[in-house]
Amino acid sequence: SGSAKVAFSAIRSTNH
């Protein structure tokens, strides 16, 4: 359930 949230957080961090 939290896997998607972690992935999104990582993508967001990389996008920054």
Swiss-Prot record:
Domain C1q residues, every copy: 1-16
GO cellular component: extracellular region; postsynaptic membrane
Biological source species: Sus scrofa
Tagged with keyword Disulfide bond: yes
Function of the protein: Required for synapse integrity and synaptic plasticity. During cerebellar synapse formation, essential for the matching and maintenance of pre- and post-synaptic elements at parallel fiber-Purkinje cell synapses, the establishment of the proper pattern of climbing fiber-Purkinje cell innervation, and induction of long-term depression at parallel fiber-Purkinje cell synapses. Plays a role as a synaptic organizer that acts bidirectionally on both pre- and post-synaptic components. The cerebellin peptide exerts neuromodulatory functions. Directly stimulates norepinephrine release via the adenylate cyclase/PKA-dependent signaling pathway; and indirectly enhances adrenocortical secretion in vivo, through a paracrine mechanism involving medullary catecholamine release.
Subunit structure: Homohexamer; disulfide-linked homotrimers. The trimers are assembled via the globular C1q domains. The trimers associate via N-terminal cysteine residues to form disulfide-linked hexamers. May form oligomers with CBLN2, CBLN3 and CBLN4 prior to secretion. Once secreted, does not interact with other CBLN family members. Interacts with GRID1. Interacts with NRXN1 and NRXN2 long (alpha) and short (beta) isoforms produced by alternative promoter usage. Competes with NLGN1 for NRXN1-binding. Weakly interacts with NRXN3 short isoform and not at all with NRXN3 long isoform.
Keywords: Cell membrane, Disulfide bond, Glycoprotein, Membrane, Postsynaptic cell membrane, Secreted, Sialic acid, Synapse
Expression (tissue specificity): Localized in the Purkinje cells. Cerebellin and [des-Ser1]-cerebellin are equally abundant.
Gene Ontology BP annotations: maintenance of synapse structure; negative regulation of inhibitory synapse assembly; synapse organization
Posttranslational modification: The proteolytic processing to yield cerebellin seems to occur either prior to the secretion by presynaptic neurons and subsequent oligomerization or in some other location after release of the mature protein. Sialoglycoprotein.
Keyword Protein biosynthesis found: no
Protein name (Swiss-Prot/TrEMBL): Cerebellin-1
Cellular compartments annotated: Secreted; Postsynaptic cell membrane
Major localisation: secreted
Superkingdom as given in the UniProt entry: Eukaryota
Disulphides: none
